């Protein structure tokens, strides 16, 4: 019985990539800078204090992978841990440092074209685009039309949105069109319908994602984004390993969290939504249990832990990011202990989002590639030239046809 469990620690980069200069990210290091701040006592809060403590990830080779990426061990991590898994770091071949590019490349399909972007900080969207969206949605107008932090824009425009019923349109350095609306005054269904209209109207702009950003709360300073976020992505430009597993092997791909949205549902046979790292962990364990009970051969359980990125990376919350990593590390053995003889566990990321870096955007970094299983030899996988090595490895593991990109590390 072959099963692969893929856990994406969204934004957990481990050192600047070789082409970071093209993105203004030379010197970025999500893991290293978090560890450094923790070691200096600058990341203490009510949930954690002191050096970054990740014993289970260190046993899988995280500290070693970080050293291979940057040339030095991250402060406080156990450099002498007994390694029980295969570890390495991967560079990104894709042209961007966004979520779809990273995930598609992990699944064997790098994004070699350039996404469309809304580069103007103010008046970001073409008038003909917003006019068509408003006309189709029968709305009187909109707010925003700018680059913005997702939480700041709620404080700035949330109350006006509630009074007027006008949605908040905003974007970022990523290829995204984001729409924020209040779940109660505007309605979640209305927001999702509006996002579908925007997705259709953006077809000619080559924008990667339309993101629904629902929120609740009575007023400024009290608004909170909910777990009902939706990402409306374009479809990958070629068959991913997920699609090949389903089409060629009759396999199962169980998506946890926003994975299904990222792949536009392509190659997904079952999806489970969950909000927050604890709930995502629980849902992942339940999916693994189901696969084992049903003797599910040729199965992938694929989880994205988005909070590392959305709640801590973009918000530049070092202490929150560190606490979340330590929570994740503490629960990791629960999944490791579930693995059967032929199962493999892959832990990785899709890009960086260094919480010590200027601004609020992603950072161009290497990602960790940690692989564990009863039949996986411990040791270094070295530097991988593309995230697609993961997809190619899965193609070899499941005996599908080869992916066009990547080299297997099995």
From Swiss-Prot:
- Which residues make up the binding site for Mn(2+) 2? 309, 314, 362
User: Is the Transport keyword given for this protein?
Assistant: no
Could you state a single Gene Ontology molecular function term? manganese ion binding
Task: Look up the record and name the pathway of this protein.
Answer: Carbohydrate degradation; 2-deoxy-D-ribose 1-phosphate degradation; D-glyceraldehyde 3-phosphate and acetaldehyde from 2-deoxy-alpha-D-ribose 1-phosphate: step 1/2
GO CC terms:
cytosol
- If you read the UniProt record, what top EC class would you report for this enzyme, in one word? isomerase
The cofactor required is: Mn(2+)
- Protein residues bound to Mn(2+) 1: 10, 350-351
Q: How is the cofactor bound?
A: Binds 2 manganese ions.
Q: Where in the cell is it found?
A: Cytoplasm
* Protein name, as recorded: Phosphopentomutase
- Lineage, highest ranks first: Bacteria, Pseudomonadati, Pseudomonadota, Gammaproteobacteria, Vibrionales
Gene (UniProt): deoB
């Amino acid at each position: 019985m072959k099963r692969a469990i893929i856990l994406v620690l969204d934004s957990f980069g481990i050192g600047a990539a070789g082409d970071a200069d093209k993105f203004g990210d030379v010197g970025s290091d999500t893991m290293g800078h978090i560890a450094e701040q923790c070691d200096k006592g600058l990341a203490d809060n009510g949930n954690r204090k002191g050096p970054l403590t990740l014993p289970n990830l260190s046993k899988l080779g995280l500290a070693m992978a970080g050293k291979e990426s940057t040339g030095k061990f991250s402060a406080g991590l156990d450099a002498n841990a007994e390694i029980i898994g295969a570890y390495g770091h991967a560079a990104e071949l894709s042209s961007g440092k966004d979520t779809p590019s990273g995930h598609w490349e992990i699944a064997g399909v790098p994004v070699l074209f350039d996404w469309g972007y809304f580069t103007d900080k103010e008046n970001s969207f073409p008038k003909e685009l917003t006019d068509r969206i408003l006309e189709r949605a029968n709305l009187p107008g909109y707010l925003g039309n700018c680059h913005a932090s997702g939480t700041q824009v709620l404080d700035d425009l949330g109350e006006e949105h509630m009074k007027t019923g006008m949605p908040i349109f905003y974007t970022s350095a990523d290829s995204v069109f984001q729409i924020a609306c209040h779940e109660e005054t505007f309605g979640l269904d209305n927001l999702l319908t509006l996002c579908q209209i925007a997705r259709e109207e953006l077809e000619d702009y080559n924008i990667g994602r339309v993101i629904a950003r629902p929120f609740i709360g009575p007023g400024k300073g009290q608004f909170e984004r909910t777990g009902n976020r939706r990402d409306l992505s374009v479809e990958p430009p070629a068959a991913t390993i997920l699609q090949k597993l389903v089409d060629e092997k009759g396999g199962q791909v169980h998506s946890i969290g926003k994975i299904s949205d990222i792949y536009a549902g392509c190659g997904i046979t079952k999806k489970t939504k969950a909000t927050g790292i604890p709930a995502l962990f629980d849902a992942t364990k339940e999916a693994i249990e189901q696969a084992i009970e049903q003797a599910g051969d040729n199965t992938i359980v694929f989880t994205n832990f988005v909070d590392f990125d959305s709640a801590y990376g973009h918000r530049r919350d070092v202490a929150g990011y560190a606490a979340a990593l330590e929570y994740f590390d503490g629960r990791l053995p629960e999944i490791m202990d579930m693995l059967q003889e032929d199962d493999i566990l892959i832990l990785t990321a899709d890009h960086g989002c260094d919480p010590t870096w200027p601004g609020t955007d992603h950072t161009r970094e290497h990602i960790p590639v940690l692989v564990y299983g009863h039949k996986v030899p411990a040791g270094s996988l070295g530097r991988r030239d593309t995230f697609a090595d993961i997809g190619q490895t899965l193609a070899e593991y499941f005996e599908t046809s080869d992916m066009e990109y990547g080299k297997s590390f099995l």
